Amino acid sequence: MIAVIGCNPVINSKEEVDRTTIVLPTEQEELVKRVAAVNPNTIVALISNYPYAIGELEKNVPAILLSASGSQELGHGIADVLTGKAAAAGRLNMTWYRSDEDLPDMNDYDIIQGKRTYQYFDREVLYPFGYGLTYAAFSYEKMQIKKERGCIKVSCFIKNTGERSADEIVQLYVHKKGSRVQRPIRQLVGFERIHDIQPKETRKVTFMVQLWELEYYDVISERMILEDGTYQFMAGASSQDLSLIHISEPTRRSYI
């Protein structure tokens, strides 16, 4: 059984409408509970263009499939994934928090002091930025870093350890250790979708990180600065599933 819930882009998720809560509507929560009580194998298809706090919902069903509004082909796409004709491989482009209490005031746009987004939020979340499951499993191996002119070359290998082919979205993050200013806990500097990886197959993934991507704007000197010191590169399946870590020390530079 499939319970379809969520929002409608022309009714309650229009761009000019701000939500006062990230809680799922009570009626939808109750619907899923009642359906799941009759059939414990009920799957939820959540159609949403923004995050919900669905921690309680997660406890009542074995699987949740998320899709944004997909126009007239939405139903066909969901059906193909649920029947195994296609393997889901999407990733969250937003952090999904556990409750309203995890968020600052709606009018507070300071992402650093308000600890907004995966870059600064330091508590447990429901689903992290970049998260997503598929019908296969992948392992990450052998991260390598090489300095080149004006950039840092980062490569790693991923292996399909599952029993069917699927896509994997490899994500690369960086963190500046010991910065003299407040920098993100981690910052996305690259991602790549690797298509149709067969069972037991290994693929190499390479990122070219430009040095300017590691810089920040210094308000005192009024220029972009690349700090000396240690930069931690992390690769994995989401912002909190980073199985490969490597250290690099790029050459300092600054310019107006």
Identify the meaning behind each predicted range.
Residues E213-T230:
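Short glycine/proline/serine/threonine-rich loop/turn segments at secondary-structure transition edges
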Residues M1-K59:
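Hydrophobic helix-and-loop "lid/oligomerization" segment in the mid-to-C-terminal part
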Residues N12-D18, P184-I185, Y217-D218:
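Short acidic, glycine/proline-rich loop/turn micro-motifs
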Residues G236-L244:
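Beta-sandwich strand segments
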Residues I245-I256:
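Single conserved hydrophobic/aromatic residue that forms the stacking wall/gate
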Residues R19-T21, N60-V61, Q171-R180, Q187-G190:
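Active/binding-pocket-proximal capping segment
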Residues I47-D167, Y173-H175, R183, P199-E201, ...:
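Secreted, periplasmic, or luminal enzymes acting at the cell surface/secretory milieu
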